[in-house]
């Protein structure tokens, strides 16, 4: 049985608890949220993980695993201290590692605690193949992200383009993964995950498109190297509770927790 504490009780966290509420091998003990959201979180936790308690931080708890589903800010506030205490962690908000020094702080904390932090694949597939290809040497990795035009509301694209007036797919960004993550932090998780599995933030090429005709999030990865080459296209349906998040992100957390809890892992 795997005893899990989770940071976050938003769309992703609730989706994870919903899918695992009938799995006896995964038990949620603590759900960590900001103080001003505790009442709302208690209602959700009571329905989805009635054995768990809601708290603002981990206290002296030592779960088997701490999983982050809360956003970039949670890494510094909760994940780094947990790693230093020797608690294994999983991270959904991989885009946070594009922030200067964050990847190094996570690694240093895990080393000090004698534990490990796992970066989850989230909304993208073939990360295992890309990471394996890196062993033999990669020459080029290109990530293209296409989303409905309104999915880019609240980003720099809204200042550069009239998103409601677009009539065709429009490139809103082209550059490195590091710059993409800096300019579009709420849309950076996939680009950052691809980068960290492959050539890194400064050598991974990224193109982002706003498409008025798109009804789903489309992720395309091209990779070439000593292994040969591959192309992957994924058409992800957005999470109903948060259209900026792919439903596959929730499924990837559930799979990762199942792999830790169950006798067979794949």
From Swiss-Prot:
Any matching Pfam family: Asp_DH_C
Locate the residues binding NAD(+). Answer: 123, 189
Question: For this protein, what is the EC number?
Answer: 1.4.1.21
Q: In which pathway does it act?
A: Cofactor biosynthesis; NAD(+) biosynthesis; iminoaspartate from L-aspartate (dehydrogenase route): step 1/1
Q: Which GO terms describe its molecular function?
A: aspartate dehydrogenase activity; NAD binding; NADP binding; oxidoreductase activity, acting on the CH-NH2 group of donors, NAD or NADP as acceptor
Briefly, what is this protein's role?
Answer: Specifically catalyzes the NAD or NADP-dependent dehydrogenation of L-aspartate to iminoaspartate.
Question: Extra info from the record?
Answer: The iminoaspartate product is unstable in aqueous solution and can decompose to oxaloacetate and ammonia.
Name the chain's protein.
L-aspartate dehydrogenase
- As recorded in Swiss-Prot or TrEMBL, the protein's gene is named nadX
């Amino acid at each position: 049985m795997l005893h899990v504490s989770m940071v976050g009780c938003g769309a992703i966290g609730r989706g994870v608890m919903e899918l695992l509420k009938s799995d006896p091998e995964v038990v949620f003990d603590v759900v960590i949220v900001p103080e001003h959201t505790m009442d709302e979180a208690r209602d959700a936790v009571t329905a989805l993980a009635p054995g768990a308690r809601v708290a603002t931080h981990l206290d002296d708890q030592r779960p088997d695993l701490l999983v982050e589903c809360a956003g970039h800010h949670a890494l510094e506030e909760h994940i780094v201290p947990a790693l230093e205490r020797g608690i294994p962690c999983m991270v959904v908000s991989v885009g946070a590692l594009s922030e200067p020094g964050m990847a190094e702080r996570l690694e240093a904390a895990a080393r000090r605690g004698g534990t490990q932090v796992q970066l989850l694949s989230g909304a993208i597939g073939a990360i295992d193949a890309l990471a394996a290809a890196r062993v033999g040497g990669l020459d080029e990795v290109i990530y293209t992200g296409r989303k409905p035009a309104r999915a880019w509301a609240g980003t720099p694209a809204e200042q550069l383009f009239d998103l409601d007036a677009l009539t065709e797919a429009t490139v809103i960004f082209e550059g490195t993964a590091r710059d993409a993550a800096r300019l579009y932090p709420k849309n950076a998780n996939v680009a950052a995950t691809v980068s960290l599995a492959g050539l890194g933030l400064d050598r991974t090429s990224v193109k982002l498109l706003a498409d008025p005709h798109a009804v789903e999030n489309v992720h395309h990865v091209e990779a070439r190297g000593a292994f040969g080459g591959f192309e992957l296209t994924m058409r992800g349906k957005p999470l109903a509770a948060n259209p900026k998040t792919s439903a596959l992100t929730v499924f990837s957390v559930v799979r990762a927790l199942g792999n830790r809890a169950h006798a067979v892992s794949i």
